[in-house]
Amino acid sequence: MKQNKMNRTKLTLCALAFVGATLNLSSCMDTKNRNPFFSEYKTPHATAPFNKIKIEHYEPALMEGIKQHEAEVNAIINNPEVPTFENTIVALDYAGTMLDRVTTVFFNLNSAETSDEMQALAQKLSPVLTEHSNNISLNEKLFARVKAVYDYADRSTLSTEQQRLLQKTYDSFARNGANLNESDKALYRELTTELSKTTLAFSQNMLKATNSYALNVTDIARLKGLPESVLEAAAQTAKEKGQEGWTFTLHAPSYGPLMMYCEDRELRRELYMAFNSQNVQDNENNNEEYVKDIVNLRLAIAQLLGYESHADYILENRMAENAANVNQLLDQLLTAYLPAAKDEVKAVQEMAVTTEGESFELMPWDWSFYSEKLRSAKYSLNDEMVRPYFKLENVTNGVFGLATRLYGITFVENKKIPVYHPDVKAYEVLDKDGSFLAVIYTDFFPRAGKRSGAWMTNYKEQYKKDGVDSRPHVSITMNFTKPTESKPALLTLDEVETFLHEFGHALHGIFAATTYPSMGGTNVYRDFVELPSQIMENFLPKKEFLATFAYHYETGELIPDELVERIVRAQNYNVAYACIRQLSFGLLDMAWYSRTSSFDGDVKAYEQEAWAPAQLLPIVEGTNMTTRFGHIMSGGYSAGYYSYKWSEMLDADAFALFDEKGIYNQAVATAFRRNILEKGSSEHPKVLYRRFRGQDATIDAMMQRDGIVK
């Protein structure tokens, strides 16, 4: 909702007050009293009071949060006592509580429930936060205290988690410019501030491009092949937009089915081009210059800090350790999977030729369509056959029930917990002894103001302080097929897999059991964080799991054994193609961030060269991945996209133990909870994995699971 002029003026004055300007005190006190961020939340489990938070609350609360954080840091700096682990490292880890509270809500909602006003505020506040972060990481007196503890602390008196926190804290300074001279610190501030602005602009362009496009079709004949459920959803979208006929968007539940089922090749091509050119067209949403800026800024920062490349900087704190190990994994998988992937493409091409003629060339907009036709022919299976058994409410019960079966935890919806949109539900998570574990929010459907994709996030971290175990608040956000006027939300197999994936991340947060807030849950190496999520995907084709929830939404019939068998037989369909596709993204990522010199070339040409070894279909002029590759440009996966395959290596090896002992084996589940899910980054991930599995992971289990080796 747009602010009126008087409120906006008042907001600006109060924000200035928090950074030292002079103004009417009673006016600001009034703002404080009405701003929910300024007091403890009086909600169940102190959850965020979304129903009371307004756009005008963020800026003054954020500025006050910065002020409080600065005061807490100054108290650490000015402590007359000798620096110790408790008075410096622990104090620093707990500092900034109010600021964290505000920024967590603001940036999470900027992804899940944003507006033009909110995005403008994000552009305004991001540089302020970057400056504040730099003020801390470049503070010489603060770093001197941290370094004193790092250099002189008796590590024999520290627990493993405390030693890890000490190392992590020291690295957070050293890797963020604390050892630079004054002129280089000034340059570091300039570069990081510019990077925060640029990555935000990149992601906002992505959101605008996605939400601004709609393909409206008024001739039903052009939609031949589309299932009734897809047509109904498209008709509902058209109605919501005030249009006639059927409307398709670039959101996955709309885009995917048209590409998979629509017989009109030109319509498929039109939507494909819209999706794959959305941030490379000659308009205000073009991201090519932002790509260059982001790549060059990250390189400049890395080299300023003494690294040859951004990849060297990032991988220093990863399981992979260096670019050589990443490239070795990518090369191993490319060699192992490429022959099978080529065979899979050939088979789909042959399927297309049977209906289109010998001269037919398989293009990217044909892949999903003919791939689905071949799958249906080989296994008598398609998404529309299984959708009726995957009613969202039943899937939710099944996924939650899986956690109950494995870990003994239960989920109870609490409608008294405020939510930020009517689609969102909030649940209390209870441990097997009935004690409170966490709050989990679920947000399932696409809407304007919500970015595409699926993700898990935290609204509150877990930690232990003063004898109290403060439990986490986590959220899983998806973009599933929406219910229509005549049918409930019915999911595809892929959507159920996505649910399991994000729920695995949520369990990582829910079970957190560390002492310090920065050490628990998903606060782990990027190439370890996907293990808890990807291991959950392995349960999907298991008959024992499907039998717990896959009931027909109309008849109540349990999914037939014969259909389950087809799902199992089809689970490795085109698995090599999917692997090579992921490897192409990994190659592209490493190509951008292994650079040791700045880039000012053609983004499209560079991309084509980078992933050429993994290209299986023709490259289409006018399309580009990099300009919409939010993962590596603005989403935290720079020099890290390989993590998905690295974690897949881990999850295949880990789940082999479940397969060996039984998928519901309590001893294995308990070991996974105690050694992986609860530990966060309190110990090195290699140590944690070996303790759970008794061995290091290799690609062998993954290749065996995928049918690449027998």
Go through each PLM region and give its residues.
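C-terminal motif of bacterial Sec signal peptides marking the signal peptidase cleavage site
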Residues: N24-S27
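C-terminal, non-catalytic "cap/extension" segments appended to globular domains
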Residues: T31-H57, E64, K224, G245-T247, ...
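N-terminal helix-rich structural modules
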Residues: T31-P227, E232, T247, F658
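Active-site-proximal, well-structured secondary-structure segments within enzyme catalytic domains
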Residues: E161, L165, K197, Q204, ...
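Bacterial N-terminal signal peptides that target proteins for export
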Residues: Q3-C14
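Short His/Asp/Glu-rich catalytic/ion-coordination signatures at enzyme active sites or charged loops
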Residues: K42-H57, F106-L125, K147-E190, T249-E289, ...
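Hydrophobic helical h-region of N-terminal Sec-dependent signal peptides
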Residues: C14-G20
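Short pre-active-site segment immediately N-terminal to the catalytic Zn-binding motif
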Residues: T481-L500
